[in-house]
């Protein structure tokens, strides 16, 4: 088990807190292992901490998934207040961990610092509260160098790292040291990564701005949808009127545009209000993206009109 605790497979019930909308692959992991997922609604500042603080009183709750910076899919960054409360949690389970997936820590869309989000440093905050073992922070170069072929890293207390290394020794004989060296020689240091990410931003920024411009032009002020305006990350989160997301998805698909499957951003793929759609602008060309965004806006209008007529 976690640092000598009872292995989860020997417990009757294991639960995880899942801020949602959130990362579908996190939810896929917990679902695969039969771990009960508890949906924690997201606010503009991060997870609803009143609920988090209440749920961790249950010793069966063993962890919480967090993408704290430019969250997938909302694109928001946890506020200092949320981070402070997270770092001061009092979980009943000694093996409770905050799984702090800082995947988008350098993924800014703008070079100017005032147009970038900033995230408090959580390991030192937890340590200051005497809770340094409560957090496992990890990230990778998946969206920096090579998707699925970069390098990953973990930051944690010495106790946690000793425990992790003990498991990793069994899992793998040796990591790809040539790939590690390749990354070190290419990036050299943190400044090298920041400079490289400016090149990513130069590609991503106009795509985000294009989609946001189309949404504002076509849907602004109509009251049939809301959307985030991220300063970084890879996604724009769009909320339709209640009960319309699946219809929008299907209309787009029928017209030749494939969106992220509706519901994917929630545990068990169940969006309780059928509203959330994750928009990923990175892949299409600018010309294709403009067509896709305009078609998406049209499908939102059609689905909304149908819903309003249905409710008359």
Spans of model-derived segments:
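Conserved core of the PLP fold type I
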Residues: 1-94, 105-130, 245, 297, ...
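Conserved core segment of the aminotransferase class I/II
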Residues: 32, 124-205, 217-218
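Hydrophobic "anchor" residues on beta-strands that sit immediately upstream
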Residues: 63, 97, 136
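Walker B catalytic acidic pair
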Residues: 101-102
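PLP-dependent enzyme catalytic core of the Aspartate aminotransferase-like
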Residues: 131, 254, 269-312
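Conserved glycine-rich beta-strand-loop-beta hairpin in the small C-terminal domain of fold type I
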Residues: 198-212, 224-239, 253
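Helix N-cap motif at beta-to-alpha junctions
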Residues: 241-245, 284-286
């Amino acid at each position: 088990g976690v640092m000598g605790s009872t292995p989860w497979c020997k417990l009757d019930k294991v639960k995880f807190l899942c801020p949602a909308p959130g990362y579908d692959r996190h939810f896929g992991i917990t679902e695969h292992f039969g771990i009960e997922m508890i949906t924690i609604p997201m606010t503009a500042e991060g997870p609803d901490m009143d609920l988090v603080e209440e749920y961790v009183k249950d010793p069966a709750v063993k962890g919480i998934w967090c993408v704290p910076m430019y969250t997938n899919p909302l694109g928001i960054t946890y506020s200092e207040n949320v981070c402070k409360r997270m770092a001061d949690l009092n979980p009943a389970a000694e093996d409770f961990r905050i799984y702090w997936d800082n995947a988008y820590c350098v993924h800014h869309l703008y070079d100017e610092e005032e147009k970038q989000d900033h995230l408090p440093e959580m390991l030192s905050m937890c340590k200051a509260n005497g809770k340094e073992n409560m957090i496992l922070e990890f990230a990778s170069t998946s969206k920096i160098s090579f998707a699925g072929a970069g390098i990953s890293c973990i930051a944690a207390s010495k106790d946690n790292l000793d425990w992790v290394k003990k498991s990793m020794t069994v899992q793998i004989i040796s990591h790809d040291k040539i790939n590690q060296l390749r990354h070190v020689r290419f990036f050299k240091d943190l400044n090298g990564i920041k400079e490289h990410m400016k090149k990513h931003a130069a590609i991503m920024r106009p795509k985000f701005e294009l989609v946001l411009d189309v949404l504002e032009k076509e849907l602004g002020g109509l009251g049939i949808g809301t959307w985030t305006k991220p300063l970084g990350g890879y996604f724009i989160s769009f909320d339709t009127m209640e009960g319309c997301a699946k219809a929008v998805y299907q209309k787009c698909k029928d017209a030749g545009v494939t969106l992220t499957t509706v519901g994917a951003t929630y545990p068990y793929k169940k969006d309780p209000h059928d509203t959330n759609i994750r928009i990923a602008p990175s892949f299409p060309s600018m010309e294709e993206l403009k067509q896709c965004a305009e078609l998406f806006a049209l499908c939102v209008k059609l689905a909304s009109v149908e819903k309003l007529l249905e409710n008359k």
